Structures are given as C-alpha cells and as structure tokens.
From Swiss-Prot:
It is a multi-pass membrane protein. It comes from Homo sapiens (Human). The keyword Transcription does not apply. This is Solute carrier family 41 member 3. Na(+)/Mg(2+) ion exchanger that acts as a predominant Mg(2+) efflux system at the mitochondrial inner membrane. Residues 1-60 are annotated as: Disordered. The lineage of its organism: Eukaryota, Metazoa, Chordata, Craniata, Vertebrata. One of its GO terms (biological process) is mitochondrial magnesium ion transmembrane transport.
Amino acid sequence: MDGTETRQRRLDSCGKPGELGLPHPLSTGGLPVASEDGALRAPESQSVTPKPLETEPSRETTWSIGLQVTVPFMFAGLGLSWAGMLLDYFQHWPVFVEVKDLLTLVPPLVGLKGNLEMTLASRLSTAANTGQIDDPQEQHRVISSNLALIQVQATVVGLLAAVAALLLGVVSREEVDVAKVELLCASSVLTAFLAAFALGVLMVCIVIGARKLGVNPDNIATPIAASLGDLITLSILALVSSFFYRHKDSRYLTPLVCLSFAALTPVWVLIAKQSPPIVKILKFGWFPIILAMVISSFGGLILSKTVSKQQYKGMAIFTPVICGVGGNLVAIQTSRISTYLHMWSAPGVLPLQMKKFWPNPCSTFCTSEINSMSARVLLLLVVPGHLIFFYIIYLVEGQSVINSQTFVVLYLLAGLIQVTILLYLAEVMVRLTWHQALDPDNHCIPYLTGLGDLLGSSSVGHTAAVPRRCTASPGWGLIQPFICTQHLIVSLLSFYFPFCLLAKTSI
C-alpha cells in the first residue's frame, strides 16, 4: 500500500509510545512528494521531528507472536506437505511424463501464486493495521482494485513463466513442439488466473475477519495463503494440463484460452485504476515479480532434471515443503517490518533504530526490538516444523520416503540456513526499499520468495543425494555430511553477496 494513505489511529486504551518501549512515530510535517518513477519521498525542506501523538503501537510479546504464528504456520505446513505428496503423485501422470517442461513450470507458477497472494496479504494487512479498510466505501475500493491488480499480474506473469520454462527446456533439449508450447502456455495462464482469484478472495476474508477479531493479520494471512495456495495451484495445474492433454486434437482450444484471458486484461486494468497506489504498482511493480519468476524458474529446472533420477529420490516431495516454509516465514517477517515502517515513519525516512542499511546479524535476531523478537520466533519454528512435516509425510508415504539420519540432519540444517539468510535479507531489503521510498510489500516479498525457491530446490538436491553415497562408501559417509554442509553454506552465501553489491549500487 502507498505511504500517502497511511493513517495512524488514536486509541484510548493505548499508552504512549515511550511507555511501551517503542520509538516515537516520525512525521515529515506534510505529505510525501511523488517522484517521476512513482516513488514517494518526503519533502527535503521538512525536518523529521518526533510526533507527540498517541498511536496504535504493537503490544505484542514473544509469546503472543508465537501463539498467533504457530497455528497458521502448522496449518500451512500441512498444506505444503500434501502439496509435496501431490507433486510426487502428479509427476507420473501422462501429461507430466510427456511434457517435461510442466515440472519446470511448478516452482515459478507456485512461486507466482505466493508472490501475488503474499504481497496482496501484506498490502491488505498494512491497510487493516493502519485503519484504511475500516470505512466501508474505502474498503470496497481497496479490495476491488487489489483483486483486479493480481488478475493482471497473474495473466501476464503466468504467460511469461511458461515462456521461461520453454526457453530453459529448449536450451537443455534443443527441440520445440508447437502443440506442447500451446498446452504449456494455456495451462500456465488458466492456472494462474484461477489460483489468483480463489486465493485473493480468501485473503480478503481472512484479513477482514482478523481485523474484526482483533488479531494481527500480518501473523496469519500469509501462512494461511501458503497452506492452501500450493495445494490449490498444483491441483489446478494438474487438472487443467491433463484436460488440455486429453483434448490435444482440438487445434484451436489452447490458443483461444490464451487470447480470451489476454482480452480480459484491459478490464482488470480499468478496475485497478480506481486506486492511485495500485496505478503506481501497475506502472512500476512488474520488475520484482518478473525477476522472482525468473529466479524460481531455475529452481524448476533443477527439479525437472533431478525428480526422475533415483539418486535424487525425495525431490518431488520435499521441494514444495522447504521452498514453501522459507517463503512463508520470510513473507511474514517482511510484512511485519513493512507495517511497522508504515505506522512509525514516512516513505524515504528510516526510524532512528533502523538507520543502518546493513545491520549486524546479531541485531536482527538478538535484540529486544519487536522485529527482532518476531525473527527469533520465526527462526525457532523451522526445525520443529520441518520435523513434524517430515513425520507426517513419512506416515503417509511409508518406505518410499528417504528416512536416513544423514538426510534428516542435513535437510533440517539446510532449512535452518535458508530461513536464517532469508530473514536477514528481509531486514536489509526492507530498509533499502523504504529508504528509496518504495513499498516493501510490493518490492521485497517477490525477490525473497523467489530466492527461497532457488535455495530450497538446490538444498534438497544436495541433501537427497547424500544417503546413497553414504551407502555406497562407508568411509565417504563419515565425511560427506560435513562436506555437504560446507557446500550448502557456500552455495547459499553465493546468492547473498551479489545481492549486496547490487543493492549498494542502487543507493
């Protein structure tokens, strides 16, 4: 949501910020000025001074955050576990066997759902926490424009995801089948549209319901979106692609589907334009979700190349779980930090305690600040969460799941490293984007979830291959966990440092 619409509400029951151990909200003395690129900046002539108004600060504690996050997180994990088992089942369907690029399409398409729904949930949560959807007329405008926006994004990026999957397939196989191209494009666009609509309506209901119940939507909206999102998206993709595969003799069916949804795009644009902040996203918000889709596509390539190989047994089941858990947790943290900045500062102006663009990692996880508290809670959920999800998958799948101690330990370590890096990057990216007067809800979550997909896919690929090597060579099995752990850390950090250099050049 846009910084110009941020409202601070006075509540008689709330104490002053100083009494709660929180910094005073900042005021620029006026409305931000829009720049040519659509970003909002505070006027330079206006100084940032403490604003002695009572606001609606967060009274959350570690326990309250944990209680609110844990239940939806576990519910989300169940959905991710079922999604992994469904993917393991769907990979043997004729359409997935015949059209290999469908597996390449899974991470970017599921990631697209995550990007759209999590950014939607984050925008709506910020709007709810700042009081913008309390007025019925304003609520209708915000909801309709946001739903129309994600339909535009789903149609365009769904088509681009299919193109990316095809290009990666061409590079590796050097062959193009026009019928398969049409099937892939139609399946991607229709799946993206249906999933975006269903999950968008669900997000609206969750945020409004949470607001009425007095629960922070930031803590529950994104986990619930993740719990059903992957399951719904995978199911729709499998059913839609199988339908087109059965009717592959109907020459004009798939092109007609693509053209029909393309023709609806101007209608969604007109509806979305009733909200000025959404207009800015339509103009300038494409790069994050497209780049995130490209990053996720490489994770899809890893999945498609390894899922059918015996030495990578478990890729199909555990890839959605580790990718979904990482993206879920980092989206919660990003949404919380974004809401904090919308409530306590103005676009382009960082609070005093967040002035450093590159904070010490210890300050991200080990201080008494509310964002550090939430980061600790989210990090503590990783290992027990993955253990529970692994046990559920093992109970359902039985002996078909890798259950060696080496795999379990490395899998948990990979998930812990992945989430640690993502949570730290969330802190850095939100500060950088807010300093540039950009909305973190729209610019950070796509990058972080896309990176989480790539890190998750590569991590599962490394860990899945270890048990067989251990069995083949007992001596190798003793040292392989340490070598693989070192390789995982180096691989994950190799994605972090290029981002640091890129971000520094943009300041």
